[in-house]
Amino acid sequence: MNVRNNTKLITINALLLAIGVILHQITPVLGLPMQPDFAITMLFIIIILNDNFKITMVSGTLMGIFTAMTTKFPGGQLPNVVDKIFTALIVFLFIALIKKSNILGRLSVEKRNNILMAIVLPLGTLVSGILFLGTAKIIVGLPASFSILFLTVVVPSVALNTVIGLVLYRIVEKSLRRASLL
């Protein structure tokens, strides 16, 4: 890959990370000290668009640090970092497994990525929520039981992230196509 393409790639990823952090910061809480995690949605978009392990892990680490700085959960800094890094790894491996199995083999890249987003958004958000709650429970404790927080925060977040994530993905994809960056 030449320097010009690397610069474009770095710039696009930085913008997507920034959008994720801004969405994470401005998203209101759902009546509990937790919120839907649209930062993870942007992380999934980065993973699908780049299909690169190093970029995935760097983006997961950076998103973890950024969301730790903007978390509204008391003591949620370390759980955010752990959650984003491991979620990025799990989602990357899941996507690699799907691609290796050739289930979506004959589809165009655009259709394949749309299907991957539709699968990854709910599953990845679920993994992220479980990792966050589990890590928070071990490190700082939870304000309510794990199961109550799972049902009242993680499950609604899965639904919200899936719907809004698909919309965000289409916006990002169309923008990158119009700019001839995809």
UniProtKB/Swiss-Prot annotation:
GO cellular component terms, A-Z: plasma membrane
Segments traversing the membrane: 10-32, 55-75, 119-141, 146-168
Keywords: Amino-acid transport, Cell membrane, Membrane, Transmembrane, Transmembrane helix, Transport
Compartments where located: Cell membrane
Entry coiled-coil feature ranges: none
Residues of the signal peptide: none
Keyword Transmembrane found: yes
Membrane topology category: Multi-pass membrane protein
Gene Ontology biological process terms in this record: amino acid transport
A Pfam entry, by short name: TrpP
UniProt cross-references to InterPro entries, sorted A to Z: TrpP
Family: Belongs to the vitamin uptake transporter (VUT/ECF) (TC 2.A.88) family. TrpP subfamily.
Summary of the function given for this chain in its UniProt record: Probably involved in tryptophan uptake.
Protein name according to UniProt: Probable tryptophan transport protein
Provenance organism: Clostridium perfringens (strain 13 / Type A)
Gene: trpP
